[in-house]
Amino acid sequence: MKTFQITRPDETIREALTDKINNLTKPKGSLGTLEELALQIGLIQQTLTPELRHPQNIIFAADHGIVDEGVSLSPKEITWQQISNFLHGGAGVNFLCRQHGFELKIVDAGVDYDLPYEKGIINMKVRKSSRNYLYEAAMTEEEMNLCIERGAEVVRQCHAEGCNVLSLGEMGIGNTSSSSMWMTCFTHIPLELCVGAGSGLDNAGVHHKYNVLQQALDHYQGDGSAHDLIRYFGGLEMVMAIGAMLQAAELKMIILVDGFIMTNCILAASQLYPEVLHYAIFGHQGDEAGHKLVLDAMGAKPLLNLGLRLGEGTGAICSYPIIDSAIRMINEMDNFAHAAITKYF
């Protein structure tokens, strides 16, 4: 598997960043999370004047073999149909990208359909759909490695275009099931607490989904390593997102983490490279059952709670103005000395 050089941001500059933030014309700590974000981004970028450049949202798309077991309300053709909607600018993620100045990239990681690549979709297809992990591993070792490498390749291109802040989204009917499997495997939270309605299952549907996933977990006979669990239960788009996250961290980019699926992707990525979490900002707590639990297990503080459960990167993009405010705070606020204000704390 491709290896990455991911290190914790150098702490040498922390004191200078903290002093700058504390000497802005406000009571110490009074801008709360904005101050925390400015400090985190300053550490990532190793500067007292951090900046956000050319924000991009990458949607990785793929189909899932486990959908054959009736774990999703939506049929798998919704995956390619929604990609068509992205191309025509009519999806939720499209208006948010337009509103907040994000470039949108759509990546075919493993959609079970012949997509129109000439319309701008990035063709990184590893295979048409993952396999059904109720009976066998979702992907081979070679396919997993290709996903990691191709996700990293997409991010290197984003970085070459001047991007230093990256939101990651997904499109793949059945991917909440893979997310629930990773969540229970890596946090040891009982599976029943990790399984939710996904795109809209009723109580009976959720119960069936849980039973299928519990059978898959019971049948698993791998070595239990993070690498093997990612390969066995993962989605092609999710593993590609892991590669993207790891490459972004190596390049010292800011990673905006979206909802339940992307949170479990960075959870899985952190099993391989724990330092990746230093580069992550968690955009929101979504409405999918289990999202709060996995965020809490990671010690993550999401910026928003809007009851979202769409995916695509929508929650991460919604949080972007808050992050922009943190950058404007550290760069545009005056300090006590220059403003001739007595420092009163």
Curated annotation (Swiss-Prot):
SUPFAM superfamilies: Nicotinate mononucleotide:5,6-dimethylbenzimidazole phosphoribosyltransferase (CobT) (SSF52733). Its EC number is 2.4.2.21. One of its GO terms (molecular function) is nicotinate-nucleotide-dimethylbenzimidazole phosphoribosyltransferase activity. Transmembrane segments: none annotated. InterPro entries: Nict_dMeBzImd_PRibTrfase (IPR003200), Nict_dMeBzImd_PRibTrfase_bact (IPR017846), Nict_dMeBzImd_PRibTrfase_N (IPR023195), Nict_dMeBzImd_PRibTrfase_sf (IPR036087). GO terms for biological process: cobalamin biosynthetic process. Catalyzes the synthesis of alpha-ribazole-5'-phosphate from nicotinate mononucleotide (NAMN) and 5,6-dimethylbenzimidazole (DMB). Belongs to the CobT family. This is Nicotinate-nucleotide--dimethylbenzimidazole phosphoribosyltransferase. It comes from Bacteroides fragilis (strain YCH46). The lineage of its organism: Bacteria, Pseudomonadati, Bacteroidota, Bacteroidia, Bacteroidales. The gene is cobT.
